[in-house]
């Protein structure tokens, strides 16, 4: 069965000629939404691990984390190329000398073919942009931005703590220096209709090189979990999620790389929706529905 969308796997094979694995690294960062600069409680859905439950051990230096991750991957695959992905918290929120050291350490490994940095659009000052531009001349650099929604009411609810205009200028600045932008969008935020979610996806699709579509997960020990357990909102059913996903893929321009169609929360922390824990079943159901509806990326893109 042919997937009629531009998946990350397709992009990686086109770009690097073979399968490439992403290694999640821990840069030992914090976030302005946690250290008191903008807030202390983080985004409403964010776990204590800073949404990096699968990242390596922060106590190890970068080279050690990469070696550890490679050993794990090589048990199940003969993959020879890797992407260094700095995942938890805000990975440009540290002194520039420190950032230069950890990012340079990561890309100095010969089998690391690209660097991916998850951060906030309000943490991309000129000094950071200068560093990223320099690194991008050595190996490709991607920047991942957690936009999540374009709707102000939802952005306030999730405590994103920056306006849409900040995302816009960050994507512009990154594109000016030749850096690929990957935008995260959450599907299933409380009080958002399907139309609202599609508006966010369309908007991101017009600004970004890649997109991660993420089901809203409720994780233990988050403020979102308190709201969920007190009955303030419901999570999406698998059928509703897949229905929304079908439309999301069709409204995305065909050149936008789809990095993720669901996302899997840490099973130990997951409170809802429990169906999302069975990743294999979810992906099979998505593929079946895509085939049934003959879903084609870009068909409804304007």
Give each language-model segment a name.
Residues 1-83:
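N-terminal [4Fe-4S]-dependent radical SAM core
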Residues 2-10, 19-21, 217-302:
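Auxiliary Fe-S-binding modules of radical SAM enzymes
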Residues 21-25, 82-84, 115-117, 141-145, ...:
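Hydrophobic faces of well-ordered beta-strands that scaffold small-molecule active sites
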Residues 49-69, 76-96, 111-124, 140-166, ...:
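Core AdoMet radical
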Residues 69-73, 124-138, 169, 198-207, ...:
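Short amphipathic alpha-helices and their capping/turn segments at secondary-structure boundaries
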Residues 73-75, 102-110, 130-140, 172-176, ...:
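Acidic (Asp/Glu)-rich catalytic clusters
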Residues 100-104, 133, 193-209, 239, ...:
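Short, electropositive alpha-helical surface patch
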Residues 165-223, 239-262:
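Conserved C-terminal portion of the radical SAM core fold
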């Amino acid at each position: 069965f042919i997937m009629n969308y531009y998946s990350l796997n397709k992009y990686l094979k086109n770009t690097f000629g073979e399968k490439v694995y992403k290694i999640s690294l821990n840069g030992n960062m914090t976030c302005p939404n946690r250290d008191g600069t903008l807030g202390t409680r983080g985004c409403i859905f964010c776990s204590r691990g800073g949404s990096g439950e699968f990242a390596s051990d922060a106590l190890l230096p970068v080279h050690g984390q990469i070696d550890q991750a490679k050993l794990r991957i090589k048990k199940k695959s003969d993959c020879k190329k890797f992407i260094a992905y700095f995942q938890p918290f805000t990975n440009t929120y540290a002194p520039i000398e420190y950032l230069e050291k950890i990012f340079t350490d990561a890309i100095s490994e010969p089998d690391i073919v690209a660097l991916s940095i998850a951060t906030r659009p309000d943490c991309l000052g000129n000094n950071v942009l200068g560093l990223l531009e320099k690194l991008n001349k050595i190996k490709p650099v991607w920047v991942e931005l957690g936009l999540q929604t374009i709707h102000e009411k939802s952005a306030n609810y999730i405590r994103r703590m920056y306006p849409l205009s900040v995302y816009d200028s960050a994507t512009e600045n990154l594109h000016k220096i030749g850096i690929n932008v990957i935008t995260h969008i959450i599907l299933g935020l409380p009080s958002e209709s399907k139309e609202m979610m599609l508006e966010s996806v369309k908007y991101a699709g017009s600004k970004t090189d890649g997109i991660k579509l993420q089901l809203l997960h409720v994780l233990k020990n988050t403020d979102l979990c308190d709201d969920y357990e007190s009955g303030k909102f419901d999570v999406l059913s698998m059928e509703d999620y897949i229905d929304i996903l079908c439309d999301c893929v069709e409204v995305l321009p065909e050149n936008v790389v789809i990095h993720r169609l669901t996302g899997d929360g840490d099973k130990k922390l997951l409170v809802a929706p429990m169906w999302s824990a069975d990743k294999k079943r979810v992906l099979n159901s998505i593929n079946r529905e895509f085939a049934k509806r003959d879903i084609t990326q870009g068909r409804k893109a304007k």
